[in-house]
């Protein structure tokens, strides 16, 4: 896995948007529109609990949150509360990629690719 400002590459596929790696290892585009209404409050579209509902069905042992190239993605208190049900790792996206690459447990990840 590799990342740079505005992109991430996973398994040879390049994505020019935020992604979610699901517990079954499929990859989808992050549904940040669900959190867009909070942009004014945070100055940036945060990650909110409304985006994390998929975790209930997937039941990962671990959740990774990649907070962007510089670690600027805000995590709302509601998201933090929901994430307390899981082992979580929240770090800048470039820092978190090696951890994801070596993880053997069932996990999910939300990865921000810009700031």
Cite the ranges covered by each PLM segment.
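Flexible, charged surface loops at secondary-structure boundaries
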Residues: 13-15, 55-59, 101-105
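Short beta-strand segments
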Residues: 22, 66, 110-114
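Mid-chain, well-packed structural core segment of small domains
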Residues: 54-87
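A short glycine-rich beta-strand->turn/loop micro-motif centered on a GG-aromatic cluster
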Residues: 87-98
């Amino acid at each position: 896995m590799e990342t740079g400002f505005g992109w991430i590459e996973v398994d040879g596929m390049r994505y020019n948007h935020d992604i979610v790696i699901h517990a079954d290892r499929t990859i989808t585009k992050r549904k940040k529109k669900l959190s867009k209404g909070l942009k004014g409050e945070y100055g940036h579209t945060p990650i909110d609990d409304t985006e994390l509902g998929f975790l209930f069905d997937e039941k990962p042992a671990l959740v990774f949150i990649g907070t962007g190239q510089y670690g600027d993605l805000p995590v709302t208190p509601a998201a933090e509360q929901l994430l307390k049900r899981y082992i979580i790792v929240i770090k800048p996206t470039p820092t978190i990629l090696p951890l994801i690459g070596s993880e053997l447990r069932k996990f999910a990840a939300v990865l921000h690719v810009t700031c």
